[in-house]
Amino acid sequence: MDHRLLEIIACPVCNGKLSFNQEHQELVCKIDRLAFPLRDGIPVMLESEARPLPQEEN
């Protein structure tokens, strides 16, 4: 994941900052507790495609 993309991309739900979870290859919004998948290196920024994060996962 290009760090420059992380500087400009935002959560589509709250417009908050995202972090990259390398283990799961997801962009994570800690505010909404959603993880957006990457498919073929392209972020899928649809709320309907996001995975809800369990309380213990960041």
From Swiss-Prot:
Taxonomy, superkingdom: Bacteria
Gene3D superfamilies, per database record: 2.20.25.10
A Pfam family that the UniProt record links to this protein: Trm112p
InterPro entries tied to this protein: Trm112-like
GO cellular component: cytosol
Matches recorded under HAMAP family: UPF0434
Family of the protein in this entry: Belongs to the UPF0434 family.
Name the record gives this protein: UPF0434 protein NT01EI_2448
